[in-house]
Amino acid sequence: MQFDHYHIRLLEQSDAAAYFELIDTNRPRLEDIFAGLVSQAKNLEEASAFLSGAEERIKAKTYFPFVVVDTTSGRLIGFIDVKNIDWNIPTAELGCFMDTQHAGKGIAKKALLLVIEYLFNTFDFLKLLIRTHESNSAARTLATQCGFGIEGHIRRDYRTTKGELVDLLYYGLSRN
């Protein structure tokens, strides 16, 4: 998938160093929002182990981690993962973040819209979900700009890196 000078593709084992750099550079702002990803990439070795596991999950179609690559620099500048997949419906949850230097430029919206189209057309998902904390205005805006509607406010639904249980807003998008 491509747009402007960006390419979206699945994360690969050869991305270990670049993936770790993306996480590490953005760690302070990701720690509570992407607790799982951050906790599995404390160093390059852990990031590499995460990628090995991710490759197996991709083959099993239980997880799809996509990266947004700046084709002019070759750098990974964003991450979109498809997780909590339920093939019985089929439905999945999306998570997304951009490198702080590329946030707020509309890149995430274009990338997410392409991934959504890909998921609906390639895997016949009937519904996609985004969960976010109510204070994450960027994620809430991104969800609504991509056609998601708020479906609920779930209390004490997510444990942050610091161990705090927080409420989440659920946004859903059904295939037309």
Which positions does each model-derived feature cover?
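Conserved GNAT-fold acetyl-CoA-binding loop/helix
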Residues: 31-53
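Generic alpha-helical scaffold signal
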Residues: 13, 24, 41-48, 62
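Acyl-donor (CoA/ACP) binding surface of acyl/acetyltransferases
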Residues: 1-18, 22-29, 65, 69-176
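A short helix-loop-beta-strand connector motif used in the catalytic cores of GNAT acetyltransferases and
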Residues: 39-40, 52-67
